[in-house]
Amino acid sequence: MGQKVHPIGMRVGIIRDWDAKWYAEKEYADYLHEDLAIRKFINKELAEASVSTIEIERAVNKVIVSLHTAKPGMVIGKGGANVDALRAQLNKLTGKQVHINIIEIKQPDLDAHLVGENIARQLEQRVAFRRAQKQAIQRTMRAGAKGIKTQVSGRLNGADIARSEGYSEGTVPLHTLRADIDYAWEEADTTYGKLGVKVWIYRGEVLPARKNTKGGK
């Protein structure tokens, strides 16, 4: 089960929280499409800013967007010019008041999305897929990860038949629900077609917070 299911989706409500924090009844579809439009726009505008997670919260006529990025200076811009322009564009896109929070990622080598993005960009620059994966694994393990697994799929080295090849180091316990496993999937556009890049990073165990019951037990 743990090998097949999405590692983050399986842990939501246990050790992970939702990336979208809002509730709706009749407007659910509209909000969902708006969320997708916001995420697509931000990923396009900030493609070079190493943005990993985008969290969206909603209040009455207000949207709070939290950007987790390894390059906060690039997102903010000189004197806050870039973030102000982004806020204005999102206000126009949604027709609501958008607030942007910027959260710095202290260790980008422990973020699966950024590691996968780095491998994908190297593959686009014709770096050998084995070398790109092994270098990423070394950097992640040096950053303090307990384990990492990577996989690249597609027409590797321009081969006629697509295949998958992966490497791993340390342990990646996908069945253990308290294991803090970050997962990401990225695409690399090469001259031979698209290559898929998958990354699993095990960052250690997280013990779920105990819930208070009646009588304080």
UniProtKB/Swiss-Prot annotation:
SUPFAM superfamilies: Prokaryotic type KH domain (KH-domain type II), Ribosomal protein S3 C-terminal domain. One of its GO terms (cellular component) is cytosolic small ribosomal subunit. GO terms for biological process: translation. PROSITE patterns: KH_TYPE_2, RIBOSOMAL_S3. Residues 38-106 form the KH type-2 domain. GO terms for molecular function: mRNA binding; rRNA binding; structural constituent of ribosome. It holds the Pfam family Ribosomal_S3_C. CDD domains: KH-II_30S_S3 (cd02412). Keywords: Ribonucleoprotein, Ribosomal protein, RNA-binding, rRNA-binding. Part of the 30S ribosomal subunit. Forms a tight complex with proteins S10 and S14. Belongs to the universal ribosomal protein uS3 family. Binds the lower part of the 30S subunit head. Binds mRNA in the 70S ribosome, positioning it for translation. This is Small ribosomal subunit protein uS3. The gene is rpsC.
